[in-house]
């Protein structure tokens, strides 16, 4: 009997110990109503704080949403000086605005045409040629060096006088063909003369371009000009050939040398008479 009672007491103590351990673990995992979460909800100084949710100075601040100077400011969106400013997109002071780029006239690079040298008159190019302008390489042609101080041979004193009075109006260089191989003098001079009178628009072809009234009024002057200038061009072409011959290393044959001397003597005799 005593042994049974002792066994029951031990079982009761063991059951009580297990229950106490289980309750302690349950209390640690899930806090009861006395934890920090429940206590925080019952804190009287936080949810009913009068200075935060019912602050009359923030949501009902009349100075911010109803500020008449910001959303309805007439000076910003309707500023006449920016979007409708006539001086910006159509600014006439900037070269080539709205036209693109053109190296010769500032025009558009759209539909740009290749540059072509203008047709010049013998008189009009006098200043540029005398100043040493480079006009070489036009269609296989080249322009010779400046020939100043040459003594030209004319047929009459009137021609000498006319050239002395008007020589400053004309260039002192000629065009010649850019040959790939040496050529004789007659070929060089003929090509040089034809190219030069064509480029300078003188001679019979120039007479056709003038009106009949102007041609009749200046007939004497035009005839004198054509006569004198064509002689000057031919002599400049001869001089240009001499320089071309020296640069190319061309040697004259004896017959050509005697012919050149004879022509020079004849020209001198005609000039003396």
Swiss-Prot record:
Residues 25-121 are annotated as: Disordered. It is found in: Cell membrane. This is Major prion protein homolog. Cu(2+) 4 binds at residues 90, 93. It is a lipid-anchor; GPI-anchor. InterPro entries: Prion, Prion/Doppel_b-ribbon_dom_sf, Prion/Doppel_prot_b-ribbon_dom. Cu(2+) 1 binds at residue 66. Residues 101-111 have a biased composition (Polar residues). Pfam families: Prion (PF00377). Residues 51-94 have a biased composition (Low complexity). Monomer and homodimer. Has a tendency to aggregate into amyloid fibrils containing a cross-beta spine, formed by a steric zipper of superposed beta-strands. Soluble oligomers may represent an intermediate stage on the path to fibril formation. Copper binding may promote oligomerization. PANTHER family: DOPPEL PRION, MAJOR PRION PROTEIN. The keyword ATP-binding does not apply. The gene is PRNP. Residues 42-89 are annotated as: 8 X 6 AA tandem repeats of [HR]-[NQ]-P-G-Y-P. Disulfide bonds join 192-237. Cu(2+) 2 binds at residue 72. Its main location: membrane. Residues 1-24 form the signal peptide. One of its GO terms (cellular component) is synaptic cleft. Cu(2+) 3 binds at residue 78. Belongs to the prion family. Its primary physiological function is unclear. Has cytoprotective activity against internal or environmental stresses. May play a role in neuronal development and synaptic plasticity. May be required for neuronal myelin sheath maintenance. May play a role in iron uptake and iron homeostasis. Soluble oligomers are toxic to cultured neuroblastoma cells and induce apoptosis (in vitro). Association with GPC1 (via its heparan sulfate chains) targets PRNP to lipid rafts. Also provides Cu(2+) or Zn(2+) for the ascorbate-mediated GPC1 deaminase degradation of its heparan sulfate side chains. Spinal cord and brain. Keywords: Amyloid, Cell membrane, Copper, Disulfide bond, Glycoprotein, GPI-anchor, Lipoprotein, Membrane, Metal-binding, Prion, Repeat, Signal. One of its GO terms (molecular function) is copper ion binding.
